[in-house]
């Protein structure tokens, strides 16, 4: 990336901390897994971070599988992708084909989840199943029209 990254302000740090400690990995949640070990992914468009001075507000939570492609112990890459979906390292188009566009689908779903947290906070690393179901249903409604392959939990 060219240029200097702006410093994270208090509300930026609070957003990233809430994602890491309270929300977990968004793709894992969408696949039905509640993951607690989360890194922060800054959303990019054509290799550049979006948002300008507000780029820390354009973030989503990803686990080490979805962010870096690191497999769990004794799992193959095929098993991981079958259970959790493809990682971002396999290519943005493959990742977005499975989970939806980062700019138009995943960031709004992450913001929806953060709004749910602001409305009714939950303890660290203890995401309620009702919240997970609500977020997943919101993602399904944004990602694709209903089809016979769309399964709501």
List the model feature ranges, each with a label.
Residues 1-2, 6-7:
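Charge-rich, low-complexity N-terminal segments
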Residues 9-41:
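Short cysteine-rich loop/turn motifs with clustered Cys
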Residues 38-46, 63-70:
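Histidine-centered catalytic micro-motifs
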Residues 39-40, 69, 89, 93-103:
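Charged, low-complexity intrinsically disordered segments
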Residues 44-59:
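Short linker/helix segments within small regulatory modules
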Residues 59-87:
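Short Cys/His-centered divalent metal-binding micro-motifs
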Residues 97-153:
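Short flanking/linker segments adjacent to small metal-binding domains or redox-active Cys/His motifs
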């Amino acid at each position: 990336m060219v240029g200097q990254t702006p410093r994270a302000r208090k509300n930026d740090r609070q957003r990233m901390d809430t994602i890491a400690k309270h929300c977990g990995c968004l793709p894992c949640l969408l696949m039905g897994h509640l993951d607690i070990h989360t890194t922060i992914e800054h959303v990019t468009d054509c290799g550049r971070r979006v948002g300008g001075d507000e780029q820390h507000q354009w973030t989503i939570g990803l686990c080490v599988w979805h962010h870096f492609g690191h497999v769990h112990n004794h799992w193959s890459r095929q098993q991981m992708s079958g259970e959790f979906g493809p990682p971002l390292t396999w290519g943005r188009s493959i990742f977005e084909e499975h989970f939806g566009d980062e700019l138009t689908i995943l960031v709004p779903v992450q913001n929806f989840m953060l709004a749910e947290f602001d409305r009714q906070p939950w303890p660290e690393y203890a995401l309620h199943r009702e919240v997970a179901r609500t977020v997943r249903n919101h993602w399904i409604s944004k990602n694709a029209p209903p089809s016979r392959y769309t399964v709501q939990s």
